[in-house]
From Swiss-Prot:
GO terms for biological process: translation. InterPro entries: Ribosomal_bL9 (IPR000244), Ribosomal_bL9/RNase_H1_N (IPR009027), Ribosomal_bL9_bac/chp (IPR020594), Ribosomal_bL9_C (IPR020069), Ribosomal_bL9_C_sf (IPR036791), Ribosomal_bL9_N (IPR020070), Ribosomal_bL9_N_sf (IPR036935). Binds to the 23S rRNA. One of its GO terms (cellular component) is ribosome. The lineage of its organism: Bacteria, Pseudomonadati, Pseudomonadota, Betaproteobacteria, Burkholderiales. It comes from Polynucleobacter necessarius subsp. necessarius (strain STIR1). Transmembrane segments: none annotated. Keywords: Ribonucleoprotein, Ribosomal protein, RNA-binding, rRNA-binding. This is Large ribosomal subunit protein bL9.
Length: 150
């Protein structure tokens, strides 16, 4: 299916690009989240009219994301989890737990934006984590997992 992108999408293209994607990806992800539209003649003409408005909106989103990225930069987030004597956690700290902790601090971050380089955190201590606030803004934070005695 050919679609026209209404915003920048990672590994796909920028605002206004006409790209071919699999039907399921377009129908189930891009179109419902208003990241793209089908590339019909009417949609392309409508996009040409609204392009300046969409570019302004994209610039505002980027500016807001950069402001959040500056606040998040070099942040140390402390998460408590039950652990054994050797520091191994009972369970793990996932991207969902980190997103919830960030929401408690006042940030609106989705769990899919939290990138754990080595998978879920299973040891107490400091762990570097990347948070993708926007496709162009990635903030590096440190997660300090504090082991609580069970």
């Amino acid at each position: 299916m050919q679609i026209i992108l209404l915003e920048k999408v990672t590994n796909l293209g920028n605002l206004g690009d006409i790209v071919r994607v699999k039907d399921g990806f377009a129908r189930n992800f891009l179109i419902p989240q208003r990241k793209a539209r089908r590339a019909t003649e009417a949609a392309i003409a409508d996009f040409a009219v609204r392009r300046a408005e969409l570019e302004k909106l994209a610039a505002e989103k980027l500016a807001a994301a950069e402001a959040v990225g500056i606040k998040l930069k070099d942040m140390v987030l402390e998460i408590g989890q039950k652990a054994g004597v050797d520091g191994r956690l009972f369970g793990s700290v996932t991207n969902h737990d980190i997103a919830d902790a960030l929401k408690a601090k006042g940030f609106t971050i989705e769990k899919s934006s939290v990138r754990l380089p080595t998978g879920p955190l299973k040891m107490a201590g400091d762990h570097p984590v990347a948070v993708a606030v926007h496709t162009d803004v990635v903030a590096d934070i440190t997660i300090r997992v504090v082991g609580e005695q069970a």
